[in-house]
């Protein structure tokens, strides 16, 4: 889908225990993953490790990134980049943190944040398990095509994403598939 896209995007898998940073170009990871503790109970240390992680990746790049895109666990105002609420894995974000605007101001590039379960499920629906299953069905002569998927993430916490008729179910808090 994006294999010929030469733009570089910084990435982050934000877990309750660790942040894992990298960069992608096209459909390929171009920097080996770099981990830092998330320090999720101390906002200042958590934000400092976010900046350190992205800075470390940027020093390894040959070209400047055009955006930051990453997954974050739990409910949030993902459209506006505000993370907060009852997040057991990130107690320091309880009162809300404008993480997207903070990173966009610091790096001067767009920031896209989405629920981790949603990104996992949508990725599998677009270019992972779902197309693979449909291709195997087609090869075997079966005309059935699946358009629905439930993806489950397991880490420090538990998350999920739901795709129905090839559309991601976001819900009113950005995590329509999560179980609370």
Identify the function of each model-found stretch.
Residues 13, 69-73, 150-157:
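Short beta-strand segments
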Residues 10-17:
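Asp-based phosphoryl-transfer active-site loop
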Residues 19-24, 159-163:
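Short beta-strand scaffold segments in enzyme catalytic cores
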Residues 44, 48, 67-68, 76-148:
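Glycine-rich phosphate-binding loop and adjoining helix at the ATP-binding site
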């Amino acid at each position: 889908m994006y294999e010929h896209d030469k733009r570089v995007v910084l990435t982050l898998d934000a877990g309750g225990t660790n942040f894992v940073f990298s960069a992608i170009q096209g459909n390929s990871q171009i920097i080996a993953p770099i981990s830092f503790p998330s320090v999720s109970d101390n906002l200042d240390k958590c934000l400092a490790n976010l900046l350190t992680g992205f800075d470390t990746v940027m020093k390894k790049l040959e070209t400047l990134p055009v955006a930051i895109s990453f997954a974050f666990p739990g409910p949030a105002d993902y459209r506006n980049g505000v993370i907060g609420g009852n997040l057991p894995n990130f107690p320091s974000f309880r009162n809300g943190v404008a993480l997207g605007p903070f990173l966009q101001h610091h790096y001067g590039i767009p920031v896209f944040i989405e629920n981790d379960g949603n990104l996992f499920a949508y990725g599998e629906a677009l270019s992972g398990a779902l197309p693979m299953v449909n291709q195997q069905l087609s090869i075997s002569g079966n005309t059935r095509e699946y358009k629905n998927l439930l993806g489950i993430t397991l880490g420090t916490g538990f998350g999920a994403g739901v795709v129905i008729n090839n559309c991601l179910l976001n819900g009113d808090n950005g995590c329509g598939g999560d179980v609370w």
